[in-house]
């Protein structure tokens, strides 16, 4: 069956409101809203079945967008299994594996879904009859902001409202006008946001896919240029028994997030935070001077780098076996994953274990403190600058021909839109396109998914492993992040003046934090907008850095202009509500009337008096209420109140 292109009138923005009350053992949808694009006729149903039947009765395929399908989708899957008599469109193979049935081969009253093993929900496809499906997409993957931020940034006519979620409600219960207004605004904000994106032709499943589609349209000449530049390296032989793509992928790492040794929990004073303007687009653009690998790799084996890899316009990747120790006054740049001997998140000062060369028994023989590194050419150059190396042996490698400026047309196009934007909406969309292309270049073949099976009136997920996804071009993906790490590390190094002197303290991918005034920040080009430059985003009079992605700065200036001082709290995994509670405890502004739970009250007050907290309380072990933990129960998912707990690194 040929898939029909959807009219925008066949696309709906949707939302559920679900029951939340004490000691509940089941949850249900008590209000379900939808609105078609280019309409303001919001329909609200009192239960999930009436909502679903509304779309079943339409004689056409429709697409529904929920903003955070991970939540609403649980209610849909539960109803498909237990209420509506639909069957999963998957086959159980004789070996126990599960295979997804293709869209065209789905039978009536069947469904399937796309949920990654990391728990990311993408879509649900429901075949209602031979000719019609209901497609359910997660708009959060295309527009990665909360509805509140989305409405504000895109300037939608409607804005998200506030409502108390807790209370005794049930399917088809009476609703107040305020409740109807709340859920109506939720779908109207989403509808307007989708209209803006679709009006510009941006209708892919995710923002990353949309970026790649746009880049390919700008780049491909229809004569094979795309395939010659970015072939599928997972279909090509590499070395060490791996495909070329698998071998090169070992060199791929994320951003440089590093807290200077000895600085954890220490209050520092009079500092500056500098941020790179669009780090990844900067590194991808030709103004950075960076060349990128294209085409096919040329592998070699042995302890050398061939002359062909060292001439101009080449980029190489290495598998190196070496011992290493950080040079005096240098910052670390080596991180080792999947090793029993080293923490996977730690940037290492030495390959030595407890300061000694060690040989330890391992499952595959002897493990030594001479380690195997898979690195880009860019990484290798920096490693040699930062470390003393010994027993170094190149095991194998590969090189590529290179091009400069291969991303320029794409980046220039969206940078111009962002720079000339007269409204926040246009600027926000341009920024999305600038910042989300690089990740698609590193996309792997991993297409593993979760498979849901009924269990105790609910369902449980099992991971099904698969590797049949079209990958990105990993040489570029790895080189982009490598160039970005080195850019940040060199800036941090220029401002590091020793452990006992003011200077670089902390970095997080595209920012450096130094206890130095702005005029003493060195080694960077400062400009508030230009690529490859740093913006002096804030100045602070005090700060404390605890671990990666966990710190507080008391900001006094933004963009070098004085502001009313405020605390900027960053703590990985800490939700906004927990930050609000911690902040009110630090400022002494807590009010009993604003406490939503007993835990809030106990955190903020003792014997009727406010509990005052300082930097000294911002340490591992700190527990702050305000975090919501999703728990699957019959009917769907509830969000249980729990604590954010600061863990040891």
Walk through the language-model features, giving the residues of each:
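Conserved acidic
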Residues: 6-7, 26-30, 36-64, 74-649
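Two-metal-ion RNase H-like nuclease active-site motif
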Residues: 9-20, 272-274
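Conserved Walker A/P-loop ATP-binding site and its immediately adjacent core
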Residues: 69-73
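N-terminal leader/early-domain signal
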Residues: 1-4, 8-9, 14, 138
């Amino acid at each position: 069956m040929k898939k029909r292109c959807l009219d925008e009138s066949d696309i709906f923005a949707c939302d559920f409101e679900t029951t939340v009350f004490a000691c509940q053992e089941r949850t249900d949808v008590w209000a379900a809203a939808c609105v078609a694009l280019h309409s303001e006729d919001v329909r609200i149903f009192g239960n999930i079945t009436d909502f679903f039947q509304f779309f079943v009765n339409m004689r056409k395929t429709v697409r529904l967008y929920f903003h955070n399908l991970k939540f609403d989708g649980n209610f849909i899957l539960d109803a498909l299994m237990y209420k509506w008599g639909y069957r999963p469109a998957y086959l159980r193979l004789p070996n126990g594996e599960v295979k997804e049935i293709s869209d065209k081969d789905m039978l009536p009253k069947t469904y399937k879904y796309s949920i990654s093993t990391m728990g990311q929900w993408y879509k649900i496809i429901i075949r209602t009859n031979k000719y019609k499906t209901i497609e359910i997409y997660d708009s959060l993957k295309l527009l990665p902001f909360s509805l509140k931020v989305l409405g504000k940034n895109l300037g939608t006519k409607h804005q998200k409202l506030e409502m108390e979620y807790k209370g005794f409600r049930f399917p088809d219960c009476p609703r107040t006008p305020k409740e109807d207004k709340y859920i109506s605004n939720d779908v109207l904000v989403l509808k307007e946001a989708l209209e803006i994106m679709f009006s510009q032709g941006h209708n892919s499943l995710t923002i990353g896919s949309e970026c790649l589609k746009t880049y390919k349209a700008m780049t491909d000449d229809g004569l094979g240029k795309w395939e010659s530049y970015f072939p599928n390296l997972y279909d090509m032989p590499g070395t060490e028994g791996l495909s070329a793509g698998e071998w090169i992928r070992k060199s791929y790492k994320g951003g440089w997030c590093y807290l200077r040794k000895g600085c954890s929990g220490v209050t520092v004073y009079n500092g500056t935070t500098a941020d790179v303007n669009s780090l990844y687009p900067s590194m991808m653009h030709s103004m950075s001077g960076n060349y990128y690998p294209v085409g096919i790799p040329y592998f070699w084996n042995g302890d050398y780098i061939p002359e062909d890899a060292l001439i101009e316009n080449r980029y190489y990747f290495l598998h190196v076996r070496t011992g290493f120790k950080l040079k005096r006054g240098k910052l670390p740049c080596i991180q080792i994953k999947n090793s029993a001997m080293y923490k996977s998140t730690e940037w290492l000062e030495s390959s030595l274990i407890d300061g000694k060369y060690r040989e330890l028994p391992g499952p595959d023989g002897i493990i030594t403190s001479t380690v195997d590194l898979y690195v880009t050419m860019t990484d290798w150059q920096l490693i040699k600058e930062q470390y003393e190396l010994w027993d170094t042996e190149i095991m194998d490698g590969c090189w590529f021909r290179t091009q400069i400026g291969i991303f320029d047309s794409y980046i220039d196009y969206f940078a111009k839109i962002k720079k000339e934007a007269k409204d926040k909406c246009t600027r926000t969309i341009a920024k999305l396109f600038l910042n989300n292309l690089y990740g698609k270049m590193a996309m792997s073949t991993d297409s593993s998914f979760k498979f849901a099976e009924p269990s105790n009136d609910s369902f449980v997920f099992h991971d099904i492993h698969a590797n049949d996804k079209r990958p990105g071009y990993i040489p570029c993906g790895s080189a982009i992040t490598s160039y970005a790490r080195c850019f940040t590390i060199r800036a941090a190094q220029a401002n590091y003046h020793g452990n006992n002197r003011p200077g670089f303290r902390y970095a997080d991918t595209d920012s450096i934090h130094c206890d130095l005034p702005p005029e003493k920040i060195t080694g960077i080009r400062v400009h508030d907008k230009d690529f490859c430059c740093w913006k002096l985003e804030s100045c602070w009079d005090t700060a404390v850095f605890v671990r990666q992605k966990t710190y507080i700065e008391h900001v006094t200036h933004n963009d070098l202009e004085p502001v009313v001082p405020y605390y900027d709290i960053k703590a990985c995994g800490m939700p906004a509500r927990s930050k609000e509670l911690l902040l009110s405890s630090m400022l002494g502004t807590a009010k009993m009337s604003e406490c939503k739970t007993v835990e809030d009250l106990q955190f903020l007050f003792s014997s009727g008096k406010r509990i005052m907290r300082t930097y000294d309380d911002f340490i591992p072990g700190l527990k702050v209420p305000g975090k919501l933990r999703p728990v699957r129960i019959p009917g769907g998912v509830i969000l249980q109140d729990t604590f954010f707990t600061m863990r040891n690194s």
